[in-house]
Curated annotation (Swiss-Prot):
It is linked to Hypercalcemia, infantile, 1: A disorder characterized by abnormally high level of calcium in the blood, failure to thrive, vomiting, dehydration, and nephrocalcinosis. Its EC number is 1.14.15.16. Belongs to the cytochrome P450 family. This is 1,25-dihydroxyvitamin D(3) 24-hydroxylase, mitochondrial. It comes from Homo sapiens (Human). It catalyses: calcitriol + 2 reduced [adrenodoxin] + O2 + 2 H(+) = calcitetrol + 2 oxidized [adrenodoxin] + H2O; calcitetrol + 2 reduced [adrenodoxin] + O2 + 2 H(+) = (1S)-1,25-dihydroxy-24-oxocalciol + 2 oxidized [adrenodoxin] + 2 H2O; (1S)-1,25-dihydroxy-24-oxocalciol + 2 reduced [adrenodoxin] + O2 + 2 H(+) = (1S)-1,23,25-trihydroxy-24-oxocalciol + 2 oxidized [adrenodoxin] + H2O; (1S)-1,23-dihydroxy-24,25,26,27-tetranorcalciol + 2 reduced [adrenodoxin] + O2 + 2 H(+) = (1S)-1-hydroxy-23-oxo-24,25,26,27-tetranorcalciol + 2 oxidized [adrenodoxin] + 2 H2O. Residues 1-35 form a transit peptide. Heme binds at C462.
Length: 514
């Protein structure tokens, strides 16, 4: 039976889902990630010469009154298969096109040089799509805004406070003991749940539990007990609240939140109650940390951020809440897909195992510094994020008129950066349907850095990127060293868009002890 957490949608995922049409699935056959650096590049063929045209001249699918292109999306497989439809549309309409769903209109980008052009024109405070239901709740309860809602100088100030801890490799490396503590328990959990064939029922749910426990230990130094046989009420209520908040949030992005609030609809009531539960739990955890380390704040992750940067408590509560929500499912989703890819590519898994064994003596717990000597492990994660990304697109809202390609786009234009389209294109990756980590290690195979952006790009890049990578790299060390991840069938698995990109069925993998 599926647990509540397996059904919850990640923050990042929902964000993406709102900003664009939903996408179609594709069949899945078969990191030290660094942000793109300024470089000398040839003139982009999409921007070279010629007069600019206005946005109305953009190609795109037929837009009908009221519905926009929704009927075509549904005809091509529904909202869960939207990502595949976007691949098709880019082939048909080119690297930049417009699409409208209902009243929501966006411009889609599917070329590295267009993303680079956008990156180079980015303002000091890049904007993303407004999340009205969240803002409505915060205003209603007089709570603060976090990094996913804040804009302008306030966003920069709060992001800078967290960036000092979360974006510096040396600071993140200090968290490996906590991550390993949860991973040790997770290995025991897998042993406990495996049947005689090595199958774990509802694996995605278990991976979410691992991710939740890991981020909570990092943020609060607290374990919620989700990897134990009987989780406590607090953990269950918290997870149920996340599930409810996400489901109601999605509905209020389709119909005006102002209407729900004024009529006090059940959706608004449930949304508000869910946020109340989430904030109550987060506040209790943070207040406990602040009190415990009041005399020595530098010894604690959150206390140091709070005291060093003079954030208000409301700002700290909101930012941590959003960071936690954004981290849980996307990290679990990434681990799920790389386990699947390794199961379908045993030769890659064997090569990865040899690298891990060459660096780590038997039974030695992996440390952050050990990962420096594991380039193939990092390449495996990078390749998995390219082939089977957690989310198929990110977004931007132009805060000034901008020329992209040959089109002049007005201020306020919502841009869909179709990163999954980039990763699946033969123009960017030879044999793009193949899981081949070696491509990231071969100098002769030059890859445009703007063709692979799993954590976004620019100043609003995912602030938890380094932490997520550390969690995933260490998890691979633990899992691959202990288990042979085997495919239990060779039938293709579809990717469906459900906030994150999820498998169409229970993944056919088994954990066989080495």
């Amino acid at each position: 039976m599926s647990s509540p957490i397996s059904k919850s949608r990640s923050l990042a995922a929902f964000l993406q889902q709102l900003r664009s049409p939903r996408q179609p699935p594709r069949l899945v056959t078969s990191t030290a990630y660094t942000s793109p650096q300024p470089r000398e590049v040839p003139v982009c063929p999409l921007t070279a010469g010629g007069e600019t045209q206005n946005a109305a001249a953009l190609p795109g699918p037929t837009s009908w009154p009221l519905l926009g292109s929704l009927l075509q999306i549904l005809w091509k497989g529904g909202l869960k298969k939207q990502h595949d439809t976007l691949v098709e549309y880019h082939k048909k309409y080119g690297k930049i096109f417009r699409m409208k769903l209902g009243s929501f209109e966006s411009v889609h980008l599917g070329s590295p040089c267009l993303l680079e052009a956008l990156y180079r024109t980015e303002s000091a405070y890049p904007q993303r799509l407004e999340i009205k239901p969240w803002k409505a709740y915060r205003d209603y309860r007089k709570e603060g805004y976090g990094l996913l809602i804040l804009e302008g100088e306030d966003w920069q100030r709060v992001r800078s406070a967290f960036q000092k801890k979360l974006m510096k490799p040396g600071e993140v490396m200090k968290l490996d003991n906590k991550i390993n503590e949860v991973l040790a328990d997770f290995m025991g959990r897998i042993d406990e749940l495996c049947d005689e064939r090595g199958h774990v029922e509802d694996l995605y749910s278990e991976l979410n539990k691992w991710s939740f426990e890991s981020i909570c230990l990092v943020l609060y130094e607290k374990r919620f007990g989700l990897l134990q046989k009987n989780a406590g009420d607090e953990a269950v209520n918290f997870i149920m609240a996340i599930k409810t908040m996400m489901s109601t949030f999605g509905r209020m992005m389709v119909t005006p939140v102002e209407l729900h609030k004024s009529l006090n609809t059940k959706v608004w009531q449930d949304h508000t109650l869910a946020w109340d539960t989430i904030f109550k739990s987060v506040k209790a955890c943070i207040d406990n940390r602040l009190e415990k380390y009041s005399q020595q704040p530098s010894a604690d992750f959150l206390c140091d951020i709070y005291h060093q940067n003079r954030l208000s408590k409301k700002e700290l509560y909101a930012a941590v809440t959003e960071l936690q929500l954004a981290a849980v499912e996307t990290t679990a989703n990434s681990l799920m897909w790389i386990l699947y890819n390794l199961s379908r590519n045993p030769q890659v898994q064997q090569k990865l195992l040899k690298e891990i064994q060459s660096v780590l003596p038997e039974n030695q717990v992996p440390r952050a510094e050990d990962l420096r000597n594991m380039p193939y492990l990092k390449a495996c994660l990078k390749e998995s994020m390219r082939l089977t990304p957690s989310v198929p697109f990110t977004t931007r809202t132009l805060d000034k008129a901008t020329v992209l390609g040959e089109y002049a786009l007005p201020k306020g234009t919502v841009l869909m950066l179709n990163t999954q389209v980039l990763g699946s294109s033969e123009d960017n990756f030879e044999d793009s349907s193949q899981f081949r980590p070696e491509r990231w290690l071969q100098e002769k195979e030059k890859i445009n850095p703007f063709a692979h952006l799993p954590f976004g790009v620019g100043k609003r890049m995912c602030i938890g990127r380094r932490l997520a990578e550390l969690q995933l790299h260490l998890a691979l060390c633990w899992i691959v060293r202990k288990y042979d991840i085997q495919a239990t069938d060779n039938e293709p698995v579809e990717m469906l868009h459900s906030g994150t990109l999820v498998p169409s069925r229970e993944l056919p993998i088994a954990f066989c002890q080495r």
